[in-house]
Amino acid sequence: VSGKLSRTMGGPAIRLYGRADGMVTVSVPDLDHPGDRWRRSLYLVGRRNYNLTLLSVFDQPKLSMNCTRRDTSAAVLQTLVLLNNTFLLEQAHSFAERVARSTRNPSKRIELAFRLALGRKPSREEASWSRELLEREIQRQLETAVEPEEADLEALASLCQMILNSNEFLHVG
């Protein structure tokens, strides 16, 4: 939904690296093309004990055995990752930029965000609290001396992050 996914098929594997804080992420300096950062996880180098941290939090199958059925879980760590992970915050911001490019009308932005992420229009109640969230976030951003256009985008990014964190989005398809 962020519009960042690279649909390039084939090519070399994407290397991972361990950061000083213990997180394992994509090794951006080793990429052949900047867009390779957004390739599907299928192209990540697979090692038994060296997996992308974000995927391991969300029940990535163990590479040391066959996986005929994926387990699902709900854990506090997943919620914390969804709220604070840099990658996910970047995706919410990219999602907001994608929506913002389409229209300036707040109601249409809300509807588009719901359609892109959840495949449906928001209910009246969802549309109402989404408008309230946008208005409140814009005011909060403006209080920090942010330019109005930036405040608008940051508020939309907050809405997009909220939609991406919804239970409905996590279980799409």
What residue spans do the PLM features occupy?
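Charge-dense polyanion-binding interfaces
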Residues: 140-165
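Surface-exposed patches in mature extracellular/periplasmic domains of secreted proteins
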Residues: 7-12, 125, 143-149
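Amphipathic alpha-helical interaction segments
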Residues: 112, 129-132, 154, 158
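Short hydrophobic alpha-helical segments that form membrane-spanning helices or hydrophobic packing faces
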Residues: 122-132, 173
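Short coil/turn helix-boundary motifs
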Residues: 102-103, 137, 141
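An acidic, gly/pro-interrupted, aromatic-rich
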Residues: 1-117, 121, 158, 163-173
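Amphipathic alpha-helical segments that form the core helices of the histone-fold
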Residues: 117, 129-139
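Alpha-helix N-cap/helix-initiation sites
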Residues: 103, 107, 123-127, 149, ...
